Amino acid sequence: MHPIPVLHGMTLGELAQMIVGEQWLDIDASSYDNAKLTVVPVQDYQRTAHYSLPVAPSPNLPNDLSIRLYPTLCFFEGTDVSIGRGTDFPFQLIGHPFVEFGKTKIPVNANSAAPHPKHENTLLSAHVFSYADPSNLEGSDSKQTTHKRSPISGLDIATLIDAYSRFSEYNKVISASDASEETFFTRPDFFDKLAGTDALRYQIQAGKTPAEIRQSWQKELSKFREKRKAYLLYEDTD
């Protein structure tokens, strides 16, 4: 596992230079000595510029909104919460058959992008994100691309904490033998893999606030920001 933040603020070329420069790959030193990495800078590129990908990077990332939400919603893959696989809104909603996330009911069915989706053949109580109004579906055509402000920004810890808290009520109505923390963290090892360590999961379970969790990152984040300076090709706006 390389010491890279979920949102590292680097282009692929810059990141490639950093991986080689810091010798993060599990290869012998002579291979690094012989490595010939060439990164060609893009003329007039601006780090703050917005652009749409010409080709969807995944069948489950069909538009700009899903890509912007991915840094947060990907963590739900380690939980019992659906992020829309098997619906018309992959990575554009959070929902569950028995825990209320919104009044909108969204069916989950297998499709080519999700042959075995979580909570298949059920109706999700879902919160569907959109640029116009996060509380409803209007204007959130899954084929639409836009540069409007995303309903949540970056890695939104509050969204994870809110979802976790909703399961406390769910735990009260299921049988005592099933009532455990794992009603939410159903794939704890995978959640920890996505986060890099088990620290984030334990912080959420311990009731830490978003501010407290973010503060715990600052020391290592500062080290990364300082280290990456040597590999940046474009003006740093962070």
Go through each PLM region and give its residues:
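Electropositive phosphate-/nucleotide-binding environments in soluble metabolic enzymes
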Residues: G9, G13, L194, Q218
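Flexible, low-complexity junctional segments that flank or bridge functional domains
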Residues: Q218, S222-L232, D236
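Conserved functional hotspot residues or short segments at active or partner-binding sites
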Residues: F89-W217
